[in-house]
């Protein structure tokens, strides 16, 4: 495999076939009339926004979703023409640019609509209403709020109400009591509207995988699009296998033998108990490979070796079982021979969730895109 467009031997590999397969399998899992929203916020959970967006659309997604307007505008600038929903709050003064770029905004206050109207200047903005059914984040909570919004929309032609949605807080937990309360609350909220809009969506990855009765007519596919389970609890109850798309790799840039009693890295936290081969890897906490990963195993030629000493900003060190040549490929996340380190393994080490692991691999790390076993593109945001 030839490395292209970057000058440090550290990169992430994104398997677009896996993205396609996950989206296509989800489409098969759902009734054919359901619209799939592919969630590509946070640079597609660290996988690459435009590449994932294009692949998801090819697999049958009918809509894209991002966190804030900047992310939507970035997709437009990169040539994405599919509908895009901004899930988070936006400023009223930015309504015009959203309307001009055919970007759908989330709304949950009549006052926001009134303020945004003055900025639209004849353009029409498509909106989805957000309901807070129990997440406690943003959204309409009371019927009076919904009625006030509906009355305002009836007297203006500046807005098109296209959708309404909520977000489940506990759909990834086996205990369904709170989920059921939220679902019932959202169903009640839907009765507050005189007429339902085109899209009604509540199900995130966890809900759409587990609760087909909660999908309404649209769903938002986030973490499962990337081949990752919404939670460790859910891994055993998935209706179909998810295929992880993310791998993280580097290469040995230096190999040396240190004597018994010699130490490695800041703080001298690792001291060799015997003569030991040490390799240096060009990845560190500025790349998202944070200091808490000291002691984590990596894969070389199908075997496991631990990281020793503190992880530095740009480099870290690995204890080798023998002398390996400089340039040997090292897998931090992914498969190497018969061994595999998963995103979930790293999340467990860090006492966090798989979402955070892929999101925290920084823009310093180039993304290499693979399709049919071939490199189809490399994105290096530094150059």
Curated annotation (Swiss-Prot):
It catalyses: L-alanine = D-alanine. The modification N6-(pyridoxal phosphate)lysine is found at residue 41. Pfam families: Ala_racemase_C, Ala_racemase_N. Keywords: Isomerase, Pyridoxal phosphate. Optimum pH is 8-10. One of its GO terms (molecular function) is pyridoxal phosphate binding. The keyword Cell cycle does not apply. Highly active at low temperatures, even at 0 degree Celsius. Thermolabile. This is Alanine racemase.
């Amino acid at each position: 495999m030839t490395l292209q467009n970057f000058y440090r031997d550290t990169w992430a590999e994104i398997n677009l076939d896996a993205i396609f397969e996950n989206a296509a399998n989800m489409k098969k899992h759902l009734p054919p009339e359901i619209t799939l929203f592919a969630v590509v916020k946070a640079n597609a959970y660290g996988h690459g926004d435009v590449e994932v967006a294009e692949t998801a659309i090819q697999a049958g997604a009918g809509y894209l979703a991002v966190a804030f307007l900047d992310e939507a505008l970035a997709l437009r600038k990169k040539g994405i023409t599919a509908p895009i929903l901004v899930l988070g709050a936006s400023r009223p003064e930015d309504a015009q640019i959203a309307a001009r770029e055919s970007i759908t905004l989330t709304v949950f206050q009549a006052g926001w609509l009134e303020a945004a109207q003055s900025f639209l200047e004849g353009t029409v903005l498509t909106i989805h209403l957000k309901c807070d059914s129990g997440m406690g984040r943003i959204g309409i909570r009371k019927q009076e709020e919904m009625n006030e919004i509906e009355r305002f929309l009836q007297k203006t032609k500046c807005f098109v109400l296209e959708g309404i949605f909520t977000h489940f807080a506990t759909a990834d937990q086996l205990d369904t009591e709170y989920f059921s309360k939220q679902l019932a609350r959202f169903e009640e909220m839907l009765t507050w509207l005189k007429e339902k809009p085109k899209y009604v969506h509540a199900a995130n990855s966890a809900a759409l995988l587990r609760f087909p009765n909660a999908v309404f007519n649209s769903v938002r596919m986030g973490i499962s699009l990337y081949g990752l389970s919404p939670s460790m609890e859910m891994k055993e109850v998935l209706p179909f296998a998810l295929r992880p798309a993310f791998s993280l790799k580097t290469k040995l840039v230096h190999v040396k033998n240190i004597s018994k009693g010699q130490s490695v890295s800041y703080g001298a936290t690792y001291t060799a108990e015997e003569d030991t081969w040490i390799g240096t890897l060009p990845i560190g906490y500025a790349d998202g490979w944070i200091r808490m990963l000291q002691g984590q195993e990596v894969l070389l030629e199908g075997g496991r070796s631990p990281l020793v000493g503190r992880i530095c900003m740009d480099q870290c060190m690995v204890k080798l079982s023998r002398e390996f040549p400089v340039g040997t490929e090292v897998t931090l996340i992914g498969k190497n021979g018969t061994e595999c380190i998963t995103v979930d393994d790293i999340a467990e080490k860090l006492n966090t969730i798989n979402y955070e692991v892929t999101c925290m691999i920084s823009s310093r790390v180039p993304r290499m895109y693979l399709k049919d076993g071939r490199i189809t593109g490399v994105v290096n945001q530094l150059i």
